[in-house]
């Protein structure tokens, strides 16, 4: 009978370089073994695997780039579980900051400007950066000072929230923009 899963398992072990080598997959002749109690000893690979099997545990290569490679005698399943748990915890603690964009034109009405500034305020309170963009069309390009006035009035309305002006008002082609970021407490 042909074992069709053997090739799949072998390919899986080759493709995943991040996975640690365990037991018979370790290719070194000699290894530095760290036992569960913390003591170290340099052993041949056969003796190290034999001691791991006697303890009912696995020989796991932790540092392959050292001569001789460093291996630990531990339960590989538990070790892998704790590694994954630690990675999930780190991922959960990361704060993802998104860049929100608020677009307007230089001939915006005061009510619309109030509405847009409330949106900017809520984005900043949520912890997101905000890119405020003013798009000029046609003859409006001759009156860029209107754009600077609008951006300054928005910054005044948002003034009660702690924010950092990440990029001052710039003109790029037909658009004027500035980027505002929330100020985080450390």
Curated annotation (Swiss-Prot):
Any one GO biological process: ribosome disassembly
PROSITE patterns found in the cross-reference section: IF3
GO cellular component: cytosol; membrane
Pfam family, one: IF3_N
Entry-linked SUPFAM superfamilies: Translation initiation factor IF3, C-terminal domain (SSF55200), Translation initiation factor IF3, N-terminal domain (SSF54364)
Gene Ontology molecular-function annotations: ribosome binding; translation initiation factor activity
Principal location: cytoplasm
Subcellular location: Cytoplasm
Keywords for the protein's UniProt record, in alphabetical order: Cytoplasm, Initiation factor, Protein biosynthesis
Protein function: IF-3 binds to the 30S ribosomal subunit and shifts the equilibrium between 70S ribosomes and their 50S and 30S subunits in favor of the free subunits, thus enhancing the availability of 30S subunits on which protein synthesis initiation begins.
Family: Belongs to the IF-3 family.
Subunit structure: Monomer.
NCBIfam families the UniProt entry points to: infC
PANTHER family for the chain: TRANSLATION INITIATION FACTOR IF-3 (PTHR10938), TRANSLATION INITIATION FACTOR IF-3, MITOCHONDRIAL (PTHR10938:SF0)
Record-linked HAMAP family: IF_3
Protein name: Translation initiation factor IF-3
